[in-house]
Swiss-Prot record:
Protein keywords: Cytoplasm, tRNA processing
Organism: Pectobacterium parmentieri
Protein's UniProt name: Protein TusB
Family note: Belongs to the DsrH/TusB family.
Subcellular location: Cytoplasm
Quaternary structure and interacting proteins, as annotated: Heterohexamer, formed by a dimer of trimers. The hexameric TusBCD complex contains 2 copies each of TusB, TusC and TusD. The TusBCD complex interacts with TusE.
Length: 95
């Protein structure tokens, strides 16, 4: 399944999201959701400890001036790669 987080992780039910992901699922952080990928934060550590493949939409990190602060343990992707993930994961859950 493809999960997307588009709101700030401080305004999302992160605990429920983490309980909902299964091994092999993908999570794309976009819009204000990219805040969750900030290096050194508690949120990124919780996400990395889960079984989910973690992706961050690069144009959204660039728009917020955060690209250099994003954890090295996530994959920065562009729109084409995001579309490819939607093809690979026909089921989607938006958070």
């Amino acid at each position: 399944m493809l999960h997307t987080l588009s709101s700030s992780p401080y305004h999302a039910d992160l605990d429920t999201l983490l309980r909902s992901v299964d091994e092999g699922d993908a999570l794309v952080l976009l819009q204000d959701g990219v805040i969750a990928a900030l290096a050194g934060g508690d949120i990124i550590h919780r996400l990395l400890a889960s079984a989910v493949f973690l992706y961050v939409l690069r144009p959204d990190t660039e728009a917020r001036g955060m690209t250099e602060q994003i954890s090295n343990n996530v994959a920065l992707i562009d729109y084409n790669e995001f579309v490819q993930l939607t093809v690979e994961h026909p089921q989607q859950l938006a958070w």
